[in-house]
From Swiss-Prot:
Name this polypeptide is given: Phosphate-repressible phosphate permease pho-4
Keywords: Cell membrane, Membrane, Phosphate transport, Symport, Transmembrane, Transmembrane helix, Transport
Region spans: Disordered: 297-361
Transmembrane region(s): 6-26, 44-64, 85-105, 118-138, 149-169, 186-206, 220-240, 246-266, 467-487, 506-525, 527-547, 561-581
Main localization (coarse): membrane
Disulfide bridge positions per record: none
GO MF annotation terms: sodium:phosphate symporter activity
Reported function: High-affinity transporter for external inorganic phosphate. Acts probably as a sodium-phosphate symporter. Component of the high affinity phosphate transport system II (ptsII) necessary for scavenging phosphorus from the environment under conditions of limiting phosphorus.
Stretches assigned to the Cytoplasmic side: 267-466
Gene field: pho-4
Source organism of this protein record: Neurospora crassa (strain ATCC 24698 / 74-OR23-1A / CBS 708.71 / DSM 1257 / FGSC 987)
Length: 590
């Protein structure tokens, strides 16, 4: 029996479920790609394209066809058996509260947990509707009940930071600080690719949305090992010859579409001289990032202390490979001579002119075709035109002195970093796919419950709500729009503002976060991908050997956002629910 008398609740739920999914794209997905963009492994536009494809494919392809009526299992839905429309109202209030809070958090650049946001909304409406006794504060297992939120504040960042630190330290002392690190990377990169593929296969097998495999444990182990070995072999055959031509021989004529040629690339002739205006085959991943000596020289020059500036420049240029913070083997890849006392402004690496997708507003009245088309482009592509990397260098209340922060971190060999950029792209894309497969339920799970209650007029059986494909497409589309239009706001507040990012660091962060999600999935521990990547970023930053490489003010700001997520969303939802169900009306005397 369709509850047509509550069509307005379905309409309101649809609007705010779209806003909730939009915020997941602008907040949750954006912080997943922040490290890759900050490390220059991908451009912002490339991150938007890859993120959109992987999130949409994960959501629609293997997204949950069946969602828990209340995903976080903090309110007993059987209490609403006699009044299913009241649960419908409660879920609408929860989605409204979650979307409002996420909008505020995204506006202020706070990376927050969307799972905890919707949980707060459900708790608030549950207290207002059935009282505090109807809320499951402590569950029968570690992943049930409200207490799981508090455990997640410690478990997620702690585990992710530990795993990411181990991965980066192995990379640091096994490759980056060794003599000839590029050749060491040629050995380690295929192994890392195989390990990463095996771990991501494990994640898909254990947390793969609606398509649950029915394999025995030995079959699962064999599949994981087989996928890892096969991927490592493919990388060795096809990618490594291409990287050899690019990194070692500096073949400036090669493009990414030459990768399928594999071993045939080794038979190419001598590399012709590059064009005079060429900027090199491998980009400088540390462009605009200063070492301590370079920063001291530039600031001394700005303060008029020419003697100190000259001394710092001489010290730095006389030993360009001198490690920072007492480390050995690290390579400084920038020319210090540009930081002489003759420069009163910061020396910046030459940046190519960025061609915007929106362009200037054409002349004419607002209702003309050209101007209206420009407004459409502005709405769709304004976010893509944002210069995220430059924004991360700007000072703000929470960004501290970013240049000083980066000066305490070591700069490793640039060509070696280039090889790790491909690993980082792989981990980010795969993490985005699994995020779409699972976390889209934060937005469409409650909405699917509202839709089924409206359609059937009764509680879903066994606390499960069917999720039609059109709802998955609806949620995934709103998520992608949020990523494209406002994802830059979270990205520019993260990445290099927490610690110095580079491909080797970013790969370690993302893989450490993925390992944490895999382990938590298997052990059913309550973790958030947002909290995992933040903990991994801090863990890798501390591997520089000093706490000064971390922007603790920003970390505290992020933690504050986690702390207030559940109570703020709960208060908004509870107030809405309480006001509505207790509101005076005609003929009501109670």
């Amino acid at each position: 029996m369709v509850l047509h008398q509550f069509d307005y609740l379905l309409a309101i739920g649809t609007i705010f479920a779209a806003l909730d999914a939009w915020n997941i794209g602008a907040n949750d997905v954006a912080n997943s790609w922040a490290t890759s963009v900050a490390a220059r492994s991908v451009t912002y536009l490339q991150a938007m394209i890859l993120g959109s494809i992987m999130e949409f494919a994960g959501s629609v392809g293997v997204g949950a066809r069946v969602a828990d009526t209340i995903r976080t299992k903090v309110v007993d839905t059987t209490l609403f058996a006699d009044d299913p429309a009241l649960l419908m109202l409660g879920m609408v209030c929860a989605v409204v509260a979650s979307s409002i809070y996420l909008t505020m958090a995204t506006r202020f650049g706070l990376p927050v947990s969307t799972t905890h946001s919707i949980m707060g909304g459900v708790i608030g409406m549950g207290i207002a509707a059935v009282g505090a006794d109807g809320v499951q504060w402590v569950g029968s297992s570690i992943n049930d009940g409200v207490v799981s939120v508090f455990l997640a504040w410690v478990i997620a960042p702690g585990l992710a930071g530990a795993f990411a630190s181990i991965i980066f330290l192995v990379t640091k002392y096994g490759v980056l600080l060794r003599s000839n690190p590029v050749y060491k990377a040629f050995v380690m990169v295929p192994i890392y690719f195989g390990i990463t593929a095996a771990l991501l296969c494990m994640l898909l097998l254990w947390k793969g949305g609606s398509y649950k495999v029915t394999l025995t444990n030995p079959e699962i182990a064999g599949t994981i090992i087989g996928v890892g070995a096969a991927w490592a072999l493919l990388v060795t055959i096809f990618l490594m010859p291409w990287l050899y031509r690019i990194v070692i021989l500096e073949d400036w004529q090669l493009r990414f579409w030459h990768i399928p040629l594999g071993p045939l690339l080794l038979r190419r002739g001598e590399v012709p001289p590059p064009p005079a205006d060429g900027s090199g085959v491998v980009q400088d991943f540390y462009a605009g990032r200063l070492t301590k000596e370079q920063l001291a020289a530039r600031r001394a020059a700005q303060n008029g202390d020419s003697e100190m500036a000259a001394g710092a420049v001489t010290s730095s240029t006389s030993n360009p490979s001198a490690p920072t913070d007492g480390e050995k083997g690290a390579t400084i890849t920038k020319d210090d001579s540009s930081y002489s006392h003759d420069h009163s402004e910061p020396a910046q690496a030459a940046q190519p002119q960025i061609k915007t997708m929106v362009g200037p507003r054409p002349a004419g009245p607002w209702h003309s075709g050209a101007v209206l088309f420009w407004y459409v482009k502005w709405a769709l592509f304004r976010g893509v035109d944002q210069d995220v990397l430059s924004s991360q260098q700007e000072k703000s209340v929470i960004s501290s002195d970013v240049e000083e922060l980066h000066a305490h971190a070591t700069h490793y060999d640039n060509k070696t970093e280039y090889m790790y950029s491909f690993l980082q792209i792989m981990t980010a894309a795969a993490a985005s796919f699994t995020h779409g497969a699972n976390d889209i339920a934060n937005a469409i799970g409650p909405y699917a419950t509202v839709f089924q209650l409206w359609k059937d007029g009764a509680l879903p059986e066994k606390g499960k709500a069917d999720v039609p494909v059109w709802i998955l497409v609806f949620g995934a589309s709103c998520l992608v729009i949020g990523l494209w239009t406002y994802g830059y706001n979270i990205m520019r507040n993260l990445g290099n503002r927490i610690t110095l990012q580079s491909p080797s660091r970013g790969f370690s962060m993302e893989l450490g976060s993925a390992v944490t999600v895999i382990l938590a999935t298997r052990l059913k521990l309550p973790v958030s991908t947002t909290q995992c990547i933040t903990g991994a970023t801090v863990g890798v930053g501390l591997c520089s050997g000093t706490w000064r490489t971390i922007n603790w003010r920003l970390v505290a700001w992020i933690y504050m956002g986690w702390f207030i997520t559940l109570p703020v969303a709960g208060i908004i939802s509870g107030c809405l629910m309480g006001i509505i169900i207790n509101a005076p009306r005609w003929g009501y005397s109670g």
